UniProtKB/Swiss-Prot annotation:
<protein>
    <recommendedName>
        <fullName>Large ribosomal subunit protein bL21</fullName>
    </recommendedName>
</protein>
<dbReference type="GO" id="GO:0005737">
    <property type="term" value="C:cytoplasm"/>
</dbReference>
<keyword id="KW-0694">RNA-binding</keyword>
<dbReference type="GO" id="GO:0019843">
    <property type="term" value="F:rRNA binding"/>
</dbReference>
<dbReference type="Pfam" id="PF00829">
    <property type="entry name" value="Ribosomal_L21p"/>
</dbReference>
<dbReference type="InterPro" id="IPR001787">
    <property type="entry name" value="Ribosomal_bL21"/>
</dbReference>
<dbReference type="GO" id="GO:0006412">
    <property type="term" value="P:translation"/>
</dbReference>
<comment type="subunit">
    <text>Part of the 50S ribosomal subunit. Contacts protein L20.</text>
</comment>
<dbReference type="GO" id="GO:1990904">
    <property type="term" value="C:ribonucleoprotein complex"/>
</dbReference>
<dbReference type="GO" id="GO:0005840">
    <property type="term" value="C:ribosome"/>
</dbReference>
<dbReference type="InterPro" id="IPR028909">
    <property type="entry name" value="bL21-like"/>
</dbReference>
<keyword id="KW-0687">Ribonucleoprotein</keyword>
<keyword id="KW-0699">rRNA-binding</keyword>
<dbReference type="InterPro" id="IPR018258">
    <property type="entry name" value="Ribosomal_bL21_CS"/>
</dbReference>
<dbReference type="InterPro" id="IPR036164">
    <property type="entry name" value="bL21-like_sf"/>
</dbReference>
<comment type="function">
    <text>This protein binds to 23S rRNA in the presence of protein L20.</text>
</comment>
<keyword id="KW-0689">Ribosomal protein</keyword>
Amino acid sequence: MYAVIKTGGKQYRVAAGDKLKVEKLAGEVGSEITLDKVLLVSDGDNTTIGSPLVQGASVQAKVVAHGRGDKVLIFKMRRRKHYRKTQGHRQSFTEIQIEKIAAK
């Protein structure tokens, strides 16, 4: 059984036992969270596609860790004007493990 969920403006295909990194979510490490924005649920034979969400479907997940991604460097430069600017950014993420997919 798998599902397609939406969180943090992105869509993920998940199955029970999967670990994935998503945009930062509120919740302590080890706590259970419920993801209600389920776009598609499939159990192999039957596939339910939401419009836009599947009614009564949810995904249970456990927060494994919080962290920050690799640094991305932004470099701006104006030629012939002696203007150079460097800026860095590290995106925060939450690593979750999918426990259960529930569909009615």
